[in-house]
Amino acid sequence: TGVKGGLIVVAADDPSMHSSQNEQDSRFYGDFSLIPMYEPSNQQEAYDMVYNGFAFSEKIGEPVLMRMVTRLAHSRSGVEQKPQQPQNQMSFSEDPRQFILLPGNARKRYKVLLERQAEFIEASENSSYNKYTDGPNKKLGIIACGIGYNYLMENYPDGCEYPVLKIGQYPLPKKQLLQLVETCD
């Protein structure tokens, strides 16, 4: 249906079942629903992604998904705050049919969603949350996302010797993935 304001859907996955009865990977939901997704690697990124995610959602007129994992969702840390945004004025949609889930309306919205995929990919390619870091040893390339990136960097406090692609925003940044593949042996 799209949105007329910012909307972030947060899914908290539980890898290794620390506090639930099953493991899930909600990244598949982002891919399946064709909407952008964020995956923070630390508390500051979680804060920044929520802050920027609301603005991005409002700009594109679609919800965005944010994937958290147990270790991050159950943690606390100080964060550097950003300026508070002014409250938007409430208004009714010019076309309320957009929010009525009937096949005729859904097909129109689906077409719009498909047309926006290039915009979502471009946003991901240019996102500061996706970062390629070169390394001197090209025998291995590492792709890390979310808190897994923090675990990687804990093992390399002086910097990783291998090229690393940190993923924080989806759809996957194909140009950066290709750069990693072409760089490594």
Predicted regions and their residues:
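Thiamine diphosphate
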Residues: T1-E58
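Flexible, low-complexity linker and terminal segments
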Residues: P40-D185
